[in-house]
Amino acid sequence: MPMPPDDSALSLLPDHPLAAHNTFGIDATARFAARVTHAAQFAALHRDPRVAHLSQLVLGGGSNVVFTRDFDGVVLLDEIAGRRVVREDDDAWYVEAGGGETWHAFVAWTLEHGMPGLENLALIPGTVGAAPIQNIGAYGLEMKTYFDSLVAVELATGRSERFDAARCAFGYRDSFFKREGRGRFAIVAVTFRLPKRWTPRLGYADVTRELDARGIAPDAATPRDVFDAVVAIRRAKLPDPLELGNAGSFFKNPVIDAAQFDALRARVPDVVSYPQPGGQVKLAAGWLIDRCGWKGRTLGAAAVHDRQALVLVNRGGATGADVLALARAIQDDVRKQFGVELEPEPVCV
């Protein structure tokens, strides 16, 4: 009788090119790569003598990474699939997705199955497993709002752990997995709590303008209307990584205290800002970069997108060093002109 397949077996791909595995399209090579389709493969890594001693990098869609050099270790390509409703009660559905699921496809699937809530996060690149690391957000919604829990494998021990929101310690484009837990875990499944009573989030003018252009009053908008509007806005503003390499918004919108904001507004009365809890103020990083004259400018083979100053692009053949040099030049100018620090969103490897 043939033996059943071993779900923990890992097939290594030596000298694996990474350009197709990062949305910037940066040419780098991994000493090894491996496609991971089962959580058991992550759990068995620490016992595999071929890779246990090597540096390990879990990669989803590669939409939040800048490769600055070849990776002398094993890149673990998270392709764990699956979407299901794990349970429901009178108030909500609890929906689980595999870490390797494409985020946008998952959002579309929830809508198709009558479970709205995530539509403001449509078309954000990357995978479900990467979403909690960054606490992705757009158009007035952060992922943490509907997050329930996740399952992650600690790579050094193979132990599976469940994390609730408190353990994830979500912040603005931040989480435990981007700080203390960076590089230690592989997220294999994420569960979301989607309320059965839908609450539209239409606080951003871009969304209401797009709805208006479609002849839809905000109070009459359906979840599908909001989804379609967000998709249209993102496609109009952001370049397709398949056509022009990029990682979406490259910098976080900086958050400053009230005293710093008052001093800045005294010098720059038209500065774009958004009040935050606790008296803090969020600034529009794209506006700051544009005001410094960077929109459309190039440095080496990297450039600032000509329609969205928050997006850095690969004009063809850009290296990670090109992208970082451009980012640092922008940071220097914004610091000199506004006294504000810009923090990159992508992780540099």
UniProtKB/Swiss-Prot annotation:
Q: Looking at the UniProt record for this protein, which Gene Ontology cellular component terms does it annotate, in alphabetical order?
A: cytosol
Tell me the keywords, alphabetical order. Cell cycle, Cell division, Cell shape, Cell wall biogenesis/degradation, Cytoplasm, FAD, Flavoprotein, NADP, Oxidoreductase, Peptidoglycan synthesis
- Reaction equations catalysed: UDP-N-acetyl-alpha-D-muramate + NADP(+) = UDP-N-acetyl-3-O-(1-carboxyvinyl)-alpha-D-glucosamine + NADPH + H(+)
Q: Which residues form the active site?
A: 173, 249, 345
Give a GO biological-process term. Answer: cell division
Where would I find the FAD-binding PCMH-type domain in this sequence? 24-197
Q: Which GO terms describe its molecular function?
A: FAD binding; UDP-N-acetylmuramate dehydrogenase activity
The pathway this protein participates in, as annotated, is: Cell wall biogenesis; peptidoglycan biosynthesis
**Keyword ATP-binding attributed:** no
**InterPro entries documented for this protein:** FAD-bd_PCMH, FAD-bd_PCMH-like_sf, FAD-bd_PCMH_sub1, FAD-bd_PCMH_sub2, MurB, MurB_C, MurB_C_sf, Oxid_FAD_bind_N
The cofactor(s) it depends on are:
FAD
Cytoplasm: present as a keyword of the record? Answer: yes
Source organism superkingdom: Bacteria
Disulfide bonds, paired cysteine numbers: none
Classification via Pfam families: FAD_binding_4, MurB_C
Cellular localisation:
Cytoplasm
Q: What does this protein do?
A: Cell wall formation.
Family annotation (NCBIfam families): murB, PRK00046.1, PRK13903.1
Q: What's this protein's name?
A: UDP-N-acetylenolpyruvoylglucosamine reductase
- UniProt organism field: Burkholderia ambifaria (strain MC40-6)
